Amino acid sequence: MLLCGLGLGGYLAWELYGTDVVAGRAQDDLRERVVQAWADGEEAEPEVVLVRIPRFGPDWEKPVLTGLDDTVLARSIGRDPDNAGPGEVGNLVLAGHRVTHGSPFRRFLDLRAGDLVEVETRDAVHTYRLREDGRRTRVDFSASWPLQPVPEPGAGRERPSEALLTLITCSEIFHTDDRSVVTGVLVETHPKTS
């Protein structure tokens, strides 16, 4: 019984803290490699971009990988490859964990309407303004509208007319089938100088 309790405690400690340490270091390393590659005028890992959310702190910057599967989300924030890219008309969808695997969206519920989100590529910085608070929209994990080209309930496959952003994470700190969602709209694009 004691061994079972110790084993369970060790597993929970690993899930809650160990994966944060390992993934956090890997995210920092990847971010540094991306910044260096761009400074050298090269591409970093294919389709890696950086995201900054000032509400999460002045130094908060995370790499965004392509894909939304468990392997990608265990490494960092993921981007839906079936939707728009940064700065493009359509829906740029980013998802990440609130707990474990670096906890990139730990403070998601602190987001406020009007907050800015910067998405940096090798060539430009795209700034989106959030339309709602992080606590406002909670959906079942099976809801598909946040992944649609126009992220609104009932919009279906409506054609987008503007560059949009959707951020998605778990609604609760511990396991839940609900997701918290915020959307934003592109307000600025600044090309980077060589």
What are these regions (language model features)?
Residues 3-194:
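Solvent-exposed, non-transmembrane regions of membrane-associated and secreted proteins
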